[in-house]
Amino acid sequence: MEAKGENDARAPLLAERRRNSVGSMRGEFVSRLPKKVLDAVDPERPSHVDFSRSKGLREGEKEYYEKQFATLRSFEEVDSIEESNVMSEEDDIAEQKQSEFAMKISNYANMILLALKIYATIKSGSIAIAASTLDSLLDLMAGGILWFTHLSMKSINVYKYPIGKLRVQPVGIIIFAAVMATLGFQVFVQAVEKLIVNETPDKLTPVQLTWLYSIMIFATVVKLALWLYCRTSGNKIVRAYAKDHYFDVVTNVVGLAAAVLGDMFYWWIDPVGAIALAVYTITNWSGTVWENAVSLVGESAPPEMLQKLTYLAIRHHPQIKRVDTVRAYTFGVLYFVEVDIELPEELPLKEAHAIGESLQIKIEELPEVERAFVHLDFECDHKPEHNILSKLPSSQP
């Protein structure tokens, strides 16, 4: 009995188990849901829920079930890859054209708005408007950085950069964000100096106010339109533009309000508004620097992504006895994936290679994945094949 129990424990988990599709798993999952959750399930799209139609659920319960349905949707994405292994090149080309168009109109808009804001700053003498103008100047500089980043990613020398230049993207965004945070610090210093000097500036004339309103409102409307357009892009560089456009909307509104209120009521409202913008700039873009820096140091993918990869590997081929290891970690914008699978010891090398290669291709078709490495083995009891700790500095004195 003990020997049998040991054999059962060591038996491959997938050897005699039916590889259930996401449809069967979803059906079983939905059949066990309580009534208050079933009310939220969309009958036309069973993997989607709308908890606004359900009552009696606590926030924790909603979060739990939303994660479960999100997992089912990710499994559906895997099944759709299994049904069609052909990537749509037309969609990729269309998205690339849309991204380049968004970058170009953003840069052209930044040039025009910079000229207008320089005029508004000269006319008004407001430090808050000056902060917004400096922001537009750096927008133009940073836009050049992002455009150069995009072009450098397109021109690839496979001998010099054998895995491409996708890591240029987060590096470019880090430089962009660092420049923006530096701007915030400079504006902060100037605003504090103006408060310390404590000199009341001259009042704005009606003509100056008219120009100020016209230019700043026009700039805000343009930036709002660009934000709405760029935020829909799947390109991370374009989304960086979108974030900057949204930031400009905030700085334009706050800058205009501070300048006008400072002129109408108390002069110190203007530098205080500039300080608020500076703190917002530093906080916002420092977070962007951190986010992109983390993506370059190999942070692990979230559990939902690992579940998705495991589901794909389990269902890939009936000869796969076990999925030993699934790793996914950032190395730039996308994930690098490592999967260890166990195949029968007697399986011919030609067939084993075909299974591993097709699994690698399938994983790399996921939009979140840049490269995949599939390791084949005939057992899963060996020690880890890579000793990362041996490369790390010793904690011993």
Curated annotation (Swiss-Prot):
Q: What is its main location?
A: membrane
Q: Which InterPro entries match?
A: Cation_efflux, Cation_efflux_CTD, Cation_efflux_CTD_sf, Cation_efflux_TMD_sf, CDF_Transporter
**Location of this chain's protein in the cell:** Vacuole membrane
Keyword entries, A-Z: Ion transport, Membrane, Transmembrane, Transmembrane helix, Transport, Vacuole
Cytoplasmic-side positions:
1-104, 148-170, 230-248, 292-397
* UniProt xrefs under Gene3D superfamilies: Cation efflux protein transmembrane domain, Cation efflux protein, cytoplasmic domain
Spell out where the chain crosses the membrane: 105-122, 127-147, 171-191, 209-229, 249-269, 271-291
User: Listed GO cellular component terms?
Assistant: membrane; vacuolar membrane
- Key word Calcium present in the record? no
Q: How does it sit in the membrane?
A: Multi-pass membrane protein
Q: What GO molecular-function term can you cite, just one?
A: manganese ion transmembrane transporter activity
Tell me, in a sentence or two, what this protein's role is.
Involved in sequestration of excess metal in the cytoplasm into vacuoles to maintain metal homeostasis.
Q: What is this protein called?
A: Metal tolerance protein 4
Q: Which organism is it from?
A: Oryza sativa subsp. japonica
